Amino acid sequence: MIVQANTQRPIAVLFGGQSPEHDVSIVTALQVMDALDPRAFRLIPIYCDFDGGYVTGPALRRRDNFRPKPTGKRGYFAWTDDGPGLVCDDKSTYHFDAVIMAYHGLYGEDGREQAHLERLGIPYTGFTSLYSALAMRKDMTKEFLASTGIRMLPHAVLERPVGGGVPSRQQLQQTLGELAFPLILKPCSLGSSIGVALVQNLAEVEAVLPSILAKDNRVLAEPQVQNLIEYNIAVRMTANGPITSAIEQPKTDADLLDFKEKYLSAGGGKKGLSPPSEGMLSLTRDINPALPPDLEAQIRSIATLAFERLGQRGAPRFDFLYDSEAGDLYFNEVNPIPGSFGHFLWEAASQPLLFPDLLPAL
């Protein structure tokens, strides 16, 4: 049986996955599907469960239909005689023109799913598999962009020894070298606020490293920026070249903006040894804060340059760290698929673009 298309353009929305950001991905996908014009698009939700299997069906438009088991048909991606589609176990095929990638984190945002679709010839939104994989590795992103002259913090990478466990104190001292404490430690390949720890000395590095290495084999170490203000901005391509969104300044009283605070609630923090976090739905933001013209120009220019070097696809968000007393701006990292695609940044841009209009533009 073939599920026939109608006058609407069939679009698949792919989400879920096996990362710690699985539930955030569901929220993003539901918001994407709610925002797209049903007169122009026929939406096919495709949910990737924790086992890596694909499920589709109209019930997946409802948030309460994912637990304990998703409601729908199981299938696999294929290029059929009628183009790309999801071939289901009951022999039905849901055809679509392209896939909107609504994943967050590993096994979805890191290039593996993109490579799967590329191999099948299926069009999709966002970074290519190569740049997705590069962007997921925070250390490799820095090395890749180093030749551009973009200013970044000095860093070191702490790796799990081949035999397991954690590096010895001597190895830690050698690897950290001249990096000055306090340091921020974070997994190289997880979301921007998962497993992040603030450490004041080598003993604290040794204390938190086992829990971070349980999440990732590589840990990025960087000096903590003093007098810190964070700025984020998104970039996308148009027919006239790249354009930038509004700038946001996340507001927090914590030393670290962790996963729970960034995506689920507004939390607090304390100085000293900060345990790794468990991870923007309710985050307080200042949109288009009053900035010195030269600082705003730097943020927009650096984000655009990084976007160009990373393939000029999607609407990635670029995150910056700013020392407000020294006046030093540092590129921090790129988020290829921001939560709900950072629609609030585009709605407040100098040329406003509402979420329902942003999605077709991708």
Where are these regions (language model features)?
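A short glycine-rich, hydrophobically flanked beta-strand micro-motif that places a catalytic Asp/Glu
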Residues: 44-46, 219-223, 231-232, 311-325
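ATP-binding N-terminal substructure of ATP-dependent carboxylate-amine bond-forming enzymes
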Residues: 1-130, 134-136, 140, 147, ...
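ATP-dependent carboxylate activation and anion-phosphoryl transfer catalytic cores
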Residues: 2-9, 15-18, 280, 284-362
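Phosphate-binding site of ATP-dependent enzymes
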Residues: 197-278, 294, 298, 329
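Residue-level detector of anion-binding/catalytic polar loops
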Residues: 42, 123, 151, 218, ...
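Short acidic-glycine loop/turn motifs at beta-strand connectors
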Residues: 49-51, 237-240, 323-326
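Active-site nucleotide/adenylate-binding loops and adjacent lid/helix of ATP-dependent enzymes
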Residues: 2-15, 19-20, 27, 93, ...
